[in-house]
C-alpha cells in the first residue's frame, strides 16, 4: 500500500496509526480469508419393520476476517450529492484529522485499501473479524402404517451467533465503522402424510410450524460529529405456520396432472432502541418516544399459494411439461432503522409464474437436452433503495414495495458424452425484465432517451460450459482433468430512479458490474478402491477482476461507492476420504 498523500501535515491532531506513519509499503491486516471447521453426525435406528428414527447434529465454527470490501469511487466535488462529505471535511475531517476525506484514498489495486478499525474520537475498536458459531439438532420419525399410507414427523432446532466488524470508507479516518453481534434461534416442526390412492394418485398433505427469535446489537459511527455515533439493539420474533396438500394423478400411462395448494400465516414483531455512545438518548423523532424507548413494528399476513401442471411422456426419450405456480415472500422491516420514519414495514411480494418446456435424450443417451421457457409476474416486489434525505428527514435506505414487474426468459441445459470418458456440459440463460408499474417505489420505467431502466441483480445473459476427460491408470486409479468457463452479462446491484446516473463520464451509472467470464480448472485423482480422491484446483485462472456486489452511496449523499471484490487467481488442494 503506498504512503497516503497529505497525511501528517501540522493540522493533524489525532494519530491515525501505522497506516499514517509508514513511509513505505505496509500490510497491517487482511480481508476475505476463509477459516471454517464443521462436522455432522447422523444416527439411523430401525425401531421396527414399520418405524425408522433418524437423529442428526451439526456444528460449525468460523473465525476469519471480514469480506474483501473495496472503496472504488469517490464523490464528484461541487455537486449536490457531495454536500454532506464536503461539510464533514470542513467541520470535522480537517480540524480533527488534519486531512480531508477524498480520492487520495483510492488505491491502484482492487485488493488494497487504507481501512483501519479504530475510532480515535470515541476510543472504540471495531475488530476486523467475521465469526460464526452455529449448531443444529434434528429428529425424524417415519411410520409406514400401510403400503398406501406413510406418516413422518420432523423436529429441528438451530441457533447461531455471528460477530463482525467492518469499515467501508477505504481510509484510516473513522468515517463509517460498525460492530455487529447477531443472534438467531429457531424451532421447526413438520408433519407429512403421504400415500397412494386409486392406483393412480400419489398425494402429500402436511403441516409446518416455525418460530424464531433474532437480535442484533450494533455499535456504529457514521460521519461522527455530523450524523451519529450510536449503539442500537434490535430484536425480532417471527412465527409462521402452514398447511399444504399436493398430488400427482396419472390420467394415463403417459399424461399426469399435478396440483397443490398451501396456506401460510406469517407474523413478525420488531423492537427497536437507540442511544448515543455516552448512553444518553438520541433526539426524539417520530415513531420513538425517545431513542432508548423501544419502538414496536408488527406485521401479519396470510397467503394462499396454488399450483397446477401437466407433463406428458411422449416416449422414453422425450417429456413435455407445462406448469402454473404461485409463491410469496413474507414482509418485514427495513434493517437497522435510524429514525421513526423508517419504522414502516413493507408487505409481502407475490409471484405468478408460467413455464413450459421439454426434457429429452438423444443418440442412445449420449446427449441430454432440456429447455424451459418462463413468464413471471411480480406484484408488490420488494426492492432495497436509497434516497437523498427529503424535508421529512427520512432515512436514506429503506425496503419498499414496487408495483408490478414482468420477467420472461429461456433456460437451456445440455450434457453430452460424445466418446467414452469425455463429458461436456453447458447451460444458457436469457431473461428480459420490464417494470410495468413502479407503484410508490420511485423506480424509473425508462430513461429520458427511451432506454428501459435496469432490473436489480438480474444479468440478461448467462452462459457456462465445461468439459472433463477420465484417464484410466489401471491399478493406480483414474485421473480426470476438468475445465469450466462461466459468463455473466452486465448486472446492476441497486434499483434506480431516472435521475441517478446517465452513464456519461461526469455522472456515471453507479453500482454496476460489467459482463465478465471466469475460468476454473481442476485435476482429480481417484484411488483404485475409490476410497480416496485428491483434487488440485485453480479458481479464476485468467485472474479476472470483478465484483460480487456493489453498494453505490454517491447519489444519496454518502460520498463513495464500495464493492465486494471477488478473489484473484487461487490454487488449492482438497483431499477426501470416503467411508
Where are these regions (language model features)?
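Solvent-exposed loop segments that connect transmembrane elements
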Residues: 1-30, 67-123, 167-178, 216-233, ...
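Transmembrane beta-barrel wall of Gram-negative outer-membrane proteins
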Residues: 1-67, 135-138, 185, 196-210, ...
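Structural signature of Gram-negative outer-membrane beta-barrels, strongest in the C-terminal barrel
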Residues: 44-48, 193-196, 202, 208-210, ...
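Repeated loop/turn-to-beta-strand initiation elements of outer-membrane beta-barrel proteins
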Residues: 50-53, 148-151, 200-203, 254-257, ...
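Transmembrane beta-strands of outer-membrane beta-barrel pores
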Residues: 59-63, 73, 157-161, 209-213, ...
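Membrane-embedded beta-barrel scaffold of Gram-negative outer-membrane proteins
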Residues: 140-144, 150-166, 313, 319-329, ...
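Gram-negative outer-membrane beta-barrel transporters
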Residues: 257, 375-377, 398-496, 576-578
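C-terminal beta-signal and adjacent terminal beta-strands/loops
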Residues: 377, 486-498, 525-579
Amino acid at each position: 500500500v503506498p504512503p497516503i498523500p497529505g497525511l501528517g501535515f501540522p493540522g493533524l491532531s489525532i494519530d491515525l496509526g501505522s497506516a499514517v506513519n509508514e513511509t513505505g509499503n505496509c500490510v497491517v491486516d487482511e480481508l476475505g480469508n476463509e477459516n471454517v471447521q464443521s462436522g455432522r453426525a447422523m444416527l439411523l435406528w430401525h425401531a421396527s419393520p414399520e418405524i425408522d428414527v433418524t437423529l442428526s447434529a451439526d456444528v460449525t465454527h468460523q473465525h476469519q476476517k471480514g469480506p474483501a470490501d473495496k472503496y472504488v469511487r469517490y464523490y464528484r466535488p461541487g455537486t449536490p450529492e457531495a454536500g454532506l462529505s464536503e461539510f464533514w471535511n470542513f467541520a470535522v475531517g480537517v480540524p480533527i484529522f488534519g486531512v480531508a476525506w477524498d480520492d487520495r484514498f483510492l488505491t491502484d489495486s482492487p485488493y488494497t485499501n487504507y481501512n483501519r478499525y479504530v475510532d480515535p474520537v470515541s476510543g472504540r475498536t471495531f475488530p476486523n473479524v467475521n465469526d460464526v458459531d452455529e449448531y443444529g439438532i434434528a429428529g425424524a420419525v417415519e411410520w409406514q402404517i400401510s403400503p398406501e399410507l406413510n406418516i413422518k414427523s420432523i423436529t429441528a432446532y438451530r441457533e447461531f451467533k455471528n460477530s463482525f466488524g467492518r469499515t467501508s470508507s477505504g481510509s484510516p479516518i473513522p468515517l463509517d465503522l460498525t460492530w455487529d453481534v447477531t443472534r438467531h434461534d429457531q424451532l421447526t416442526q413438520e408433519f407429512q402424510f403421504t400415500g397412494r390412492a386409486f392406483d393412480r394418485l400419489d398425494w402429500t398433505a402436511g403441516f409446518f410450524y416455525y418460530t424464531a427469535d433474532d437480535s442484533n446489537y450494533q455499535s456504529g459511527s457514521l460521519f461522527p460529529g455530523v450524523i451519529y455515533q450510536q449503539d442500537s439493539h434490535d430484536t425480532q420474533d417471527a412465527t409462521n405456520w402452514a398447511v399444504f396438500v399436493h398430488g400427482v394423478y396419472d390420467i394415463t400411462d403417459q399424461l399426469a396432472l399435478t396440483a397443490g395448494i398451501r396456506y401460510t400465516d406469517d407474523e413478525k414483531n420488531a423492537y427497536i432502541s437507540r442511544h448515543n455512545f455516552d448512553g444518553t438518548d438520541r433526539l426524539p423523532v417520530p415513531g420513538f418516544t425517545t431513542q432508548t424507548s423501544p419502538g414496536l413494528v408488527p406485521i401479519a399476513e396470510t397467503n394462499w399459494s396454488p399450483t397446477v401442471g401437466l407433463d406428458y411422456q411422449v416416449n422414453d426419450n422425450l417429456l413435455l411439461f407445462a406448469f402454473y405456480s404461485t409463491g410469496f415472500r413474507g414482509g418485514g422491516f427495513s434493517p437497522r432503522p435510524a429514525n421513526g420514519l423508517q419504522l414502516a414495514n413493507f408487505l409481502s411480494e407475490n409471484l405468478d409464474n408460467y413455464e413450459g418446456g421439454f426434457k429429452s435424450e438423444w443418440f442412445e443417451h449420449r446427449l441430454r437436452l432440456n429447455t424451459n421457457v418462463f413468464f413471471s409476474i411480480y406484484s408488490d416486489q420488494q426492492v432495497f433503495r436509497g434516497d437523498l434525505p427529503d424535508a421529512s428527514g427520512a432515512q436514506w435506505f429503506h425496503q419498499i414495495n414496487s408495483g408490478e414487474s414482468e420477467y420472461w426468459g429461456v433456460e437451456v441445459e445440455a450434457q453430452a458424452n460424445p466418446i467414452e470418458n469425455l463429458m461436456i456440459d453447458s447451460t444458457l440463460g436469457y431473461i428480459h425484465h420490464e417494470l410495468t408499474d413502479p407503484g410508490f417505489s420511485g423506480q424509473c420505467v425508462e430513461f429520458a432517451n427511451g432506454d428501459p431502466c435496469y432490473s436489480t441483480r438480474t444479468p440478461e445473459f448467462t452462459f457456462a460450459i465445461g468439459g472433463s476427460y477420465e484417464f484410466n491408470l489401471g491399478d493406480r486409479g483414474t485421473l480426470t482433468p476438468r475445465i469450466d468457463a462461466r459468463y455473466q452479462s452486465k448486472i446492476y446491484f441497486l434499483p434506480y430512479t431516472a435521475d441517478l446516473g446517465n452513464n456519461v463520464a461526469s455522472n456515471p451509472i453507479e453500482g454496476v458490474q460489467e459482463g465478465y467470464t471466469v475460468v476454473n480448472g481442476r485435476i482429480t485423482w481417484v484411488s483404485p478402491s475409490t476410497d480416496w480422491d485428491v483434487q488440485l484446483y485453480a479458481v479464476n485462472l485468467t485472474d479476472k477482476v470483478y465484483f460480487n456486489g456493489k453498494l453505490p452511496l454517491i447519489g444519496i449523499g454518502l460520498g463513495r461507492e464500495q464493492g465486494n471484490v471477488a478473489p484473484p487467481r487461487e490454487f488449492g488442494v482438497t483431499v477426501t476420504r470416503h467411508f
